[in-house]
Amino acid sequence: MELKTEEEEVGGVQPVSIQAFASSSTLHGLAHIFSYERLSLKRALWALCFLGSLAVLLCVCTERVQYYFCYHHVTKLDEVAASQLTFPAVTLCNLNEFRFSQVSKNDLYHAGELLALLNNRYEIPDTQMADEKQLEILQDKANFRSFKPKPFNMREFYDRAGHDIRDMLLSCHFRGEACSAEDFKVVFTRYGKCYTFNSGQDGRPRLKTMKGGTGNGLEIMLDIQQDEYLPVWGETDETSFEAGIKVQIHSQDEPPFIDQLGFGVAPGFQTFVSCQEQRLIYLPSPWGTCNAVTMDSDFFDSYSITACRIDCETRYLVENCNCRMVHMPGDAPYCTPEQYKECADPALDFLVEKDQEYCVCEMPCNLTRYGKELSMVKIPSKASAKYLAKKFNKSEQYIGENILVLDIFFEVLNYETIEQKKAYEIAGLLGDIGGQMGLFIGASILTVLELFDYAYEVIKHRLCRRGKCQKEAKRNSADKGVALSLDDVKRHNPCESLRGHPAGMTYAANILPHHPARGTFEDFTC
């Protein structure tokens, strides 16, 4: 009987020799190194060239991998034409926070020192610097004899004493059609009571423009009311040395941050602001530093740098002063004038100017901003001064000192996309490595698989020869026994040799009644 030998069973088929594998391998040069010839100069040169190419390949691949993990990015700039564009939100603030005529005796009692109108003894600090008319009014309001102060609220004070858009707005047109003060939404900033045109809030649709150029945007004429400016006898955060308005052009998805991002418009000039919408797309870490997650805030739904800053400043003041400024969101109590002077203003100034670690606001991954180009002309001209003075029932001097015109429009009806892209992606890395492998050693991914497959067969065979596989196979054979093939059984059939045995060698019928008469051994084996 022919059985499989133990060597074949436990060790498997012996792998081909290294020479045979090299001759059939797709790796260039391997057949010349491991040839059947005796060691020669030719084989040594081939081995040297192969090792040199392999070393260069490893150096190049290492450099490519290191470059990939630097996570470089490039910036793509493109301009896209559009049939229409959403007009931006325009927020404007008078640089004077409170109208002098609206400051009551109770306001002066509580906030006079904050506004630098009174000293800590409730006295006018420097009467020589005051205008006679203003001084007379102020002296009357500052007489607190037998005065009983009433409750005071900073939010109510800002709302009541701030400049009213209905008094400031002399003319308004959007795309040639008349607009009014009703199209402006009240918003509080660090400049006090401000107004936003085209806010897109309170159910109002966002206005769109179909053309570029002047006359196709917002044109307003404003009276800044310098006669209502508070007299300046000292330097505080609530007093202003300038006259005019502060303007910020921004997306409807972000709150105004006008004290940091606004630009000034002076009276006596018509200011033209040519805009271009810019859509910026930044990459998240590790290619960039943008914030790809939603904002974790109780005050704002969408993330933006301005929303992050306002949220952070609010938390900072609540933690340090136990109150919030009027322009800050939340439900914490408003700061009193004393808290404004002693804590809130100094704390916020410190946070904005010096503390670079508390408020770290990352760039959002998608951002819309508006590039601006400003130009201006003098207004009124000598020819129009008398007409405007008559039209608004003011003097020519008042017109020159208080009237301004602001014209905001898109330069052209397109938008600019500024997009960060990965400079080197995984596909490029694999392509470079594959190209270098083909150039230096003529290999591919399948070639590498060939090498691993051959190495696996060799290692497996050697481990089995050491006896590990033999012990396992012996345990298996003890359980299963020896397997015989059908041919083996036929060749060793015991019945063949017993055919034709003597007839007398039979069993009695009563022993095996259902069996035919057979030979003694034939019956048991067959």
UniProtKB/Swiss-Prot annotation:
Instruction: Give the species.
Output: Mus musculus (Mouse)
Question: What is the tissue specificity?
Answer: Expressed in brain areas receiving strong excitatory corticofugal input. In hippocampus, expressed in the hilus of the dentate gyrus. In the cerebral cortex expressed in anterior and posterior cingulate cortex, sensory and motor cortices. In the sensory cortex strongest expression is detected in the whisker barrel field. In sensorimotor and cingulate cortex expression is elevated in layer III. Also expressed in basal ganglia, striatum, ventral pallidum, olfactory tubercle, and nucleus accumbens. Weakly expressed in thalamus with the exception of the habenula and the medial septal nuclei.
Official protein name in the record? Acid-sensing ion channel 1
Q: How is it modified after translation?
A: pH-gating could be regulated by serine proteases. Phosphorylation by PKA regulates interaction with PICK1 and subcellular localization. Phosphorylation by PKC may regulate the channel.
Q: Which reaction is recorded as catalysed by this protein?
A: Na(+)(in) = Na(+)(out); Ca(2+)(in) = Ca(2+)(out)
Q: What do the Gene Ontology cellular component annotations say?
A: dendritic shaft; dendritic spine; glutamatergic synapse; Golgi apparatus; membrane; plasma membrane; postsynaptic density membrane; presynapse
List the residue(s) that the UniProt entry marks as the site Involved in proton-dependent gating: D355
The family annotation for this protein states:
Belongs to the amiloride-sensitive sodium channel (TC 1.A.6) family. ASIC1 subfamily.
Side of membrane Cytoplasmic, spans: 1-49, 457-526
How does the entry describe the domains?
The second transmembrane domain (TM2) is a discontinuous alpha-helix disrupted by the GAS motif, which forms the selectivity filter by adopting an extended, belt-like conformation aligned approximately parallel to the membrane plane. This peptide belt encircles the waist of the channel and divides TM2 into two discontinuous helical segments. The distal helical segment of TM2 interacts with the cytoplasmic portion of the first transmembrane domain (TM1) from a neighboring subunit, contributing to the structural and functional integrity of the channel.
User: What is said about its interaction partners and assembly?
Assistant: Homotrimer. Heterotrimer; with other ASIC proteins producing channel with different properties. Interacts with PICK1; regulates ASIC1 clustering in membranes. Interacts with STOM; alters heterotrimeric ASIC channels activity.
Give the superkingdom in one word.
Answer: Eukaryota
Keywords in alphabetical order, please.
Answer: Calcium, Calcium transport, Cell membrane, Cell projection, Disulfide bond, Glycoprotein, Ion channel, Ion transport, Membrane, Phosphoprotein, Postsynaptic cell membrane, Sodium, Sodium channel, Sodium transport, Synapse, Transmembrane, Transmembrane helix, Transport
Pfam families in UniProt: ASC
Look up and give the membrane topology term: Multi-pass membrane protein
- What is this protein's function? Forms voltage-independent, pH-gated trimeric sodium channels that act as postsynaptic excitatory receptors in the nervous system, playing a crucial role in regulating synaptic plasticity, learning, and memory. Upon extracellular pH drop this channel elicits transient, fast activating, and completely desensitizing inward currents. Displays high selectivity for sodium ions but can also permit the permeation of other cations. Regulates more or less directly intracellular calcium concentration and CaMKII phosphorylation, and thereby the density of dendritic spines.
* Carbohydrate-modified residues: N366, N393
Gene inactivation phenotype reads: Knockout mice lacking Asic1 display absence of acid-evoked currents in hippocampal neurons and impaired hippocampal long-term potentiation (LTP). An absence of acid-evoked currents in amygdala neurons and an alteration of amygdala-dependent behavior including deficits in cue and context fear conditioning are also observed. This is associated with altered spatial learning, memory capability and fear conditioning.
Q: Transmembrane region positions?
A: 50-66, 426-456
* Span(s) of short sequence motif GAS motif: 442-444
